Amino acid sequence: MRTAPTILHLDMDAFFASVEQASKPSLRGKAVVVGGLGPRGVVATCSYEARVFGVHSAMPMGQARRLAPHAAYLVPRFELYRSISEQVMRLLRELSPLVEPLSLDEAFVDLDAGGAARDAETARLAGTKLRTDIRTVTGLTGSVGLAASKMLAKIASEAAKPDGLVLIPPGTERAMLEPMTVRTLPGVGPATGDHLRRAGITTVGEIAEAGEDELVRLLGKAHGHALYAMALARDERPVVAERETKSVSVEDTYDVDIHDRVRVGVEVGRLADRCVRRLRASGLSGRTIVLKVRRYDFSTLTRSETLRGPTDDPAVVREAAARLLDSVDTTGGVRLLGVGVSGLADYTQEDLFAQAAGDRAEEPAEEPGTEPAEAHSPSPAERRWPSGHDVRHTELGHGWVQGSGLGRVTVRFETPYSGVGRVRTFLVDDPELTPADPLPLVADTEGGAGQPSSGPLPLPASLPKSWSGGGGAAATSRP
């Protein structure tokens, strides 16, 4: 393990919810929940204000509504989240060529590899500057952990939340880890934690005291060896730049089981088109098409077909997905469908036979009711108004959907740069109201530095956790 705290872990604070608060002045400082809003929806993330009421990620949306009935419930805007994530990742790549993204809002950075830090002092300066740059470019906050290993850097960033920085000086790792619960260590979930608790082991220090042989006896060879090493603060894993994408996929869960076989086919076609758009956006193609079907009884079936060469042609992917669907019995009802592409490559091999078959497969898609929804501009009566999504009115300007139903849609007219806006209600087919693209969170920027027009978002009134390290082993800083 290295001798300087030059591995940085960044975790954006309540990322999806923070984006929504930054773009909607009326939601700043309020409880915000982002996720699927149907009866089977789950929470993707929530603001710290919502966490005070017990709401958390992966919770069923119905339970979240019971805990926080007055929160704002919004449909995710993934394209906006990806765009902001790329702004953050560009800032990380300015620090080092070794950036390991873990998700849209989380990444490791090897500061030593880029010359950005060589010791604790320069690492702290780099982490502080990064947090300032993220706030300037995106208007959002992120928490930074600095340590000599990936495991410790991630533990430090958790302790820094929200909007803080924690540095673990080399030589203090064991003292910092010992009083922490076993669940602090990566790979220790509820089952392993309960198993250790029944053996009288509840802290990381007690894991180290138990010894490697006892841990192997309790947990098996691989897990026992790994857990013992982590308890001793040993972690030699390097930061791996831009881990290779293995597959691209999309899926939808339906509020009501689909029984109509024709509609199932239409949904599979739409998913295939969405998957190809994501594939092309990444500059990739693939040769293995995968269909996922979750039936009414929660049984999940996966079917795949490998083509003769990579493709990014929507007709080819649609036809392959349709063939796979032919082998699946859906008569009892379908609650989830997914289409994916694996065997990825950065080039496309033309397959004339598949292309010709795909052209034929496209013809039925032009019939009413079977064309993918995104392939044409819907009339006003056909439009959906997802809660939280952007709209524009010809007279009132930019706003977002607060809710819709009973033939009405309610819109709040405000932007990231305005004050709290006024609310108006329209008929869902009002010709002056149209869907709109999201506005940048920071005004007057072009992918670079700028200033949040209405100031930084305030810290939540109630912080979710506090640093539990002992003896001053870690240094914590907040604005």
Swiss-Prot record:
Catalytic class of the enzyme: transferase
Function statement: Poorly processive, error-prone DNA polymerase involved in untargeted mutagenesis. Copies undamaged DNA at stalled replication forks, which arise in vivo from mismatched or misaligned primer ends. These misaligned primers can be extended by PolIV. Exhibits no 3'-5' exonuclease (proofreading) activity. May be involved in translesional synthesis, in conjunction with the beta clamp from PolIII.
Alphabetical list of Gene3D superfamilies matching this protein: 3.30.70.270, 3.40.1170.60, 5' to 3' exonuclease, C-terminal subdomain, DNA polymerase, Y-family, little finger domain
Record-stated family: Belongs to the DNA polymerase type-Y family.
Residues flagged as site, Substrate discrimination: 16
**What does the record give under GO molecular function?**
damaged DNA binding; DNA-directed DNA polymerase activity; magnesium ion binding
* Catalytic residues, chain numbering: 106
* Keyword line: Cytoplasm, DNA damage, DNA repair, DNA replication, DNA-binding, DNA-directed DNA polymerase, Magnesium, Metal-binding, Mutator protein, Nucleotidyltransferase, Transferase
Q: What is the lineage of its organism?
A: Bacteria, Bacillati, Actinomycetota, Actinomycetes, Kitasatosporales
**PANTHER family given in the database record:** DNA POLYMERASE KAPPA, DNA REPAIR POLYMERASE UMUC / TRANSFERASE FAMILY MEMBER
- Signal sequence range: none
Q: Could you tell me what reaction this enzyme catalyses?
A: DNA(n) + a 2'-deoxyribonucleoside 5'-triphosphate = DNA(n+1) + diphosphate
User: Per its UniProt record, what InterPro entries does this chain match?
Assistant: DNA/RNA_pol_sf, DNA_pol_Y-fam_lit_finger_sf, DNA_pol_Y-fam_little_finger, DNA_polymerase-Y, DNApol_IV, IMS_HHH_1, Rev_trsase/Diguanyl_cyclase, UmuC
According to its UniProt record, where is this protein located? Cytoplasm
| Protein's UniProt name | DNA polymerase IV
Explain how, and how many, cofactor molecules are bound. Binds 2 magnesium ions per subunit.
Q: What cofactor requirement does the entry state?
A: Mg(2+)
Biological process (GO) annotations held by this record are:
DNA-templated DNA replication; error-prone translesion synthesis; SOS response
Carries keyword Cytoplasm? yes
User: In the UniProt record, which is one GO cellular component term?
Assistant: cytoplasm
Domain UmuC positions:
7-189
Q: Residue ranges of region Disordered?
A: 357-400, 430-479
The species this protein belongs to is Streptomyces coelicolor (strain ATCC BAA-471 / A3(2) / M145)
Q: Where is the composition biased (Basic and acidic residues)?
A: 381-396
